[in-house]
């Protein structure tokens, strides 16, 4: 039986991440090789980005993807999010030279309030929203608070890039295959304060913590490497990590939509108060996905080091969310 096309809205569609993302969505890598998609693409209403978006759409046409059932270009979120089943909020304002963090939060606050309101007004009531644009956790919080008629659980932030970076570092350290690393998670904010936690992780069924058995490596090498990886890539490439971010967005949405087959993955979700994280803070947690829903992994013990790291990333998130509360 042929499936009915689903509508996938992508913001910042002509940007670097958008360019790395759209072809993979259209080829079926995100929602399955049997699921047709209609792309609803949003860019800012300036001539340059709209022209660039038109060029990207020409290329999408030229791929003749069997699953691409249609696409439209937009400058208004009310049109771009109409009946959207999935929304990937990639576009955000990057921090410019000399820009204060408070200024950055305010500029992005305005963007994500407008997008949250538009989703609230016109998207599918089951829309799955992934915020990629930074600061991702706080932008997801803003969009969620601006969409009171949609369930809180529909809004997520992308921690999967940190998760994948951590998996890759662990695989390299232990000499194991990345596919064999399981039960790793990343707690907190998508920022250098995130806490990548391999205490429960296994590689080929063996304990990763026992294999590595080096707390100094954990604190002084592993965590800084994962936390500062984005900056290291900008330093090396002269541009931010776009392809790996797009790949993480595909992974996040695919697992949410199609299931993670019992594997732990990391998603930024609105807290219900578990693990001592105050309600509604959008925080990286370990989850499993099945039947289009995510389920928090409950009951993990947190040692003193983990508590300290989680409190530090929580404090940063609370400061960010306090910084935008006056906008909401």
From Swiss-Prot:
Gene3D superfamilies documented for this protein: Lactate dehydrogenase/glycoside hydrolase, family 4, C-terminal, NAD(P)-binding Rossmann-like Domain
Keywords carried by this UniProt record: NAD, Oxidoreductase, Tricarboxylic acid cycle
Coiled coil segments of this chain: none
A single GO molecular function term of this UniProt record: L-malate dehydrogenase (NAD+) activity
Keyword Hydrolase: no
Binding site for NAD(+): 12-18, 108, 115, 132-134
Amino acids binding substrate: 95, 101, 134, 165
Enzyme Commission number, as recorded: 1.1.1.37
Organism superkingdom: Bacteria
Transmembrane segments: none
GO biological process: malate metabolic process; tricarboxylic acid cycle
Class of enzymatic activity (EC top level): oxidoreductase
Listed SUPFAM superfamilies: LDH C-terminal domain-like, NAD(P)-binding Rossmann-fold domains
Catalytic activity entry: (S)-malate + NAD(+) = oxaloacetate + NADH + H(+)
Family matches, as InterPro entries: L-lactate/malate_DH, Lactate/malate_DH_C, Lactate/malate_DH_N, Lactate_DH/Glyco_Ohase_4_C, Malate_DH_type2, NAD(P)-bd_dom_sf
Record's function text: Catalyzes the reversible oxidation of malate to oxaloacetate.
Family designation: Belongs to the LDH/MDH superfamily. MDH type 2 family.
UniProt name for this protein: Malate dehydrogenase
Organism: Verminephrobacter eiseniae (strain EF01-2)
């Amino acid at each position: 039986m042929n499936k009915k096309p689903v509508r996938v809205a992508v913001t910042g569609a002509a940007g670097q991440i958008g360019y790395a993302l759209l072809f993979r969505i259209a080829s079926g890598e995100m929602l399955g090789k049997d699921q047709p998609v209609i792309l609803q693409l949003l860019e800012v209403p300036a001539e340059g980005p709209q022209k660039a978006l038109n060029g990207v759409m020409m290329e999408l046409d030229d791929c003749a993807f069997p699953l691409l059932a249609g696409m439209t270009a937009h400058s208004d979120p009310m049109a771009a999010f109409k009946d959207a089943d999935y929304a990937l909020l990639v576009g955000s304002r990057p921090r410019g030279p000399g820009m204060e963090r408070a200024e950055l939060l305010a500029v992005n606050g305005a963007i994500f309030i407008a997008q949250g309101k538009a989703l609230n007004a016109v998207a599918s009531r089951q829309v799955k929203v992934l915020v990629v644009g930074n600061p991702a956790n706080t932008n997801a919080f803003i969009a969620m608070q601006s969409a009171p008629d949609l369930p809180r659980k529909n809004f997520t932030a992308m921690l999967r890039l940190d998760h994948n970076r951590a998996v890759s570092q662990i695989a390299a350290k232990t000499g194991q295959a990345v596919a064999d690393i399981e039960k790793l998670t990343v707690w907190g904010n998508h920022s250098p304060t995130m806490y990548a936690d391999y205490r429960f992780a296994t590689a080929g069924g063996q304990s990763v913590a026992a294999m590595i058995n080096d707390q100094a490596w954990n604190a002084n090498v592993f965590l800084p490497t994962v936390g500062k990886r984005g900056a290291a890539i900008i330093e090396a490439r002269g541009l931010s990590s776009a392809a790996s971010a797009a790949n993480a967005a595909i992974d996040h949405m695919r697992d949410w939509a199609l299931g993670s087959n019992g594997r732990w993955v990391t998603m930024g979700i609105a807290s219900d108060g578990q693990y001592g994280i105050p309600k509604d803070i959008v925080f990286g947690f370990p989850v499993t996905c099945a039947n289009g829903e995510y389920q928090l992994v409950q009951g993990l013990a947190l040692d003193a080091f983990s508590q300290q790291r989680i409190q530090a990333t929580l404090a940063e998130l609370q400061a960010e969310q306090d910084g935008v509360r006056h906008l909401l």
